[in-house]
């Protein structure tokens, strides 16, 4: 599975770390991939505009009764912070659930049609744990790049005759198309169900923006701590530039000014305890020559919840939210293709996904709902692309077979196409795991 989370806006709680500004703040895409049944996770952290520091709070500029609709806190920064062990486990649980849902779609579509299935795996590579049930091997594997459902079609050790009508390769194109597309359908349904549960249980959070930028946290021994900034302060202006209530735009102004002024005084206009006053902060010099002060920043907003008053309104809320997330995913995918030179460096692997998910989990349940829903939608959209080793690539081969009057491509050709795609994804995934691991804050401090 390949996920593309490029279009996720940040929320009021999504903190931006002003300590390692190697990367601009950006949105993260995520992609999902399946060869018939093989899934791989590789996200891309892609900015929503050419001005990479320009973040936006809202999806689709929607207006709700109590303010502007906000969506979950997605962010990408150069220094990845995994946070607490509990939040990491929550993020891993979300990713694992998404993999299981996707592969279960393939598995159930095959089983319900009487098609032989031999394996159901989470992860790739060496087997860590396994058990057999009803002639199917269920396994947990070493590399967390996705999962797969295996079929005995080309297994030389299989005792099933090669002409058995219940082998996947011997079924009509419609049956095979259902199996291949079932993972996509499962993720779409799951995303809708997640949003439905969110609306009924906690409602949809909305926000009203206020001038300035909130400082949720000040790191110990940082420039900000040394020069007097405190957690809970609201920054109203920087070097005489007043900060509006446009959320991430105001955050970006602070980021720009701090980055440009290492070892130089920056004057912050602060609101604290009902009083306004100035504080001079001297940013430390980062390893890349930019300034850093060691704080988290977030838009200064007030959050309320909107709950549906009846069943029809529930479905309207859910449908609007689902369409908004889907639109964002499609926009992010379009930007990935049309601005590839700018977005290629934002590709990230499972470690970065878990880091972002952990940050979401540390915030509140609203963000975790939207994190899971968005990843499912990304998974479905990306898998529709007609590329080797993706569900869409397999569907394209089935369509080509139908156009050719049921004449299949030579087995060697089809296997070569899929195998090359899978190997590329595996090597890319391993590379990204190493890259993202080296970006972890505690690893960078050790190096």
Swiss-Prot record:
Pfam (any one):
Peptidase_M50
Q: Which residues cross the membrane?
A: 177-197, 379-399, 413-433
Entry-linked CDD domains:
S2P-M50_PDZ_RseP-like
Extract the GO molecular function terms from the UniProt entry: metal ion binding; metalloendopeptidase activity
Residues reported to bind Zn(2+): 102, 106
GO BP: any one term: chloroplast organization
Instruction: Summarize what gene deletion causes.
Output: Lethal when homozygous.
Membrane topology field: Multi-pass membrane protein
Q: Which Gene3D superfamilies match?
A: 2.30.42.10
Any GO CC annotation of this UniProt entry: chloroplast
What residue ranges carry the coiled-coil annotation?
A: none
**What is the annotated tissue distribution of the protein whose record heads this document?**
Expressed in green seedlings and cotyledons. Low levels of expression in roots, siliques and seeds.
- E.C. no: 3.4.24.-
Please report the stretch or stretches of sequence annotated as the PDZ domain. Answer: 202-244
Q: Which domain of life is it from?
A: Eukaryota
Per the record, the similarity remark reads: Belongs to the peptidase M50A family.
Q: What name does this protein carry?
A: Membrane metalloprotease ARASP, chloroplastic
């Amino acid at each position: 599975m390949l996920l593309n989370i490029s279009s996720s806006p940040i929320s009021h709680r999504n903190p931006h770390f002003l300590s390692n500004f190697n990367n601009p703040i950006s949105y993260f895409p995520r992609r999902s991939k399946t060869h018939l049944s093989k899934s791989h996770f590789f996200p891309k952290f892609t900015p929503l505009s050419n001005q990479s520091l320009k973040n936006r709070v809202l999806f689709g500029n929607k207006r709700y009764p109590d303010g502007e609709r906000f969506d979950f806190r997605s962010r990408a920064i150069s220094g990845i912070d995994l946070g607490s062990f509990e939040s990491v486990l929550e993020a891993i649980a979300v990713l694992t659930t998404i993999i299981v849902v996707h592969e279960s779609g393939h598995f159930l579509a095959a089983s319900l049609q009487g098609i032989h299935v031999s394996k159901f795996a989470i992860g790739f590579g060496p087997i860590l744990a396994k058990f057999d049930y009803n002639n199917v091997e269920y396994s947990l594997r070493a590399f967390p790049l996705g999962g797969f459902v295996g079929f005995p079609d080309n297994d030389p050790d299989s005792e099933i005759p090669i002409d058995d009508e219940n082998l996947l390769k011997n079924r009509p194109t419609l049956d095979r198309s259902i199996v291949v597309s079932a993972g996509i359908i499962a993720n779409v349904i799951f995303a809708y169900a997640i949003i439905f549960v969110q609306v009924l249980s906690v409602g949809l959070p909305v926000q009203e923006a206020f001038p300035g930028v909130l400082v949720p946290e000040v790191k110990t021994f940082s420039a900000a701590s040394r020069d007097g900034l405190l957690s809970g302060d609201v920054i109203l202006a920087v070097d005489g530039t007043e900060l509006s209530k446009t959320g991430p735009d105001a955050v970006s102004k602070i980021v720009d000014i701090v980055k440009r002024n290492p070892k130089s005084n920056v004057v912050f206009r602060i609101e604290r305890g009902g009083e306004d006053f100035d504080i001079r902060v001297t940013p430390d010099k980062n390893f890349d020559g930019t300034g850093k002060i060691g704080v988290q920043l977030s838009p200064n907003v007030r959050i309320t919840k909107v709950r549906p008053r009846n069943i029809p309104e529930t479905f309207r809320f859910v449908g609007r939210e689902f369409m908004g997330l889907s639109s964002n995913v499609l926009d992010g995918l379009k930007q990935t293709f049309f601005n590839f030179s700018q977005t290629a460096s934002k590709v990230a692997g499972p470690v970065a996904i878990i880091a972002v998910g952990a940050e979401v989990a540390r915030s509140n349940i609203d963000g975790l709902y939207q994190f899971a829903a968005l990843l499912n939608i990304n998974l479905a959209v990306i898998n529709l692309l007609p590329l080797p080793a993706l569900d869409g690539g397999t569907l394209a081969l089935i369509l080509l077979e139908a156009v050719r009057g049921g004449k299949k491509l030579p087995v060697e050709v089809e296997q070569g196409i899929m195998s090359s795609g899978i190997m590329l994804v595996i090597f890319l995934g391993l590379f990204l795991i190493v890259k993202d691991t080296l970006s972890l804050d505690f690893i960078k401090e050790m190096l």
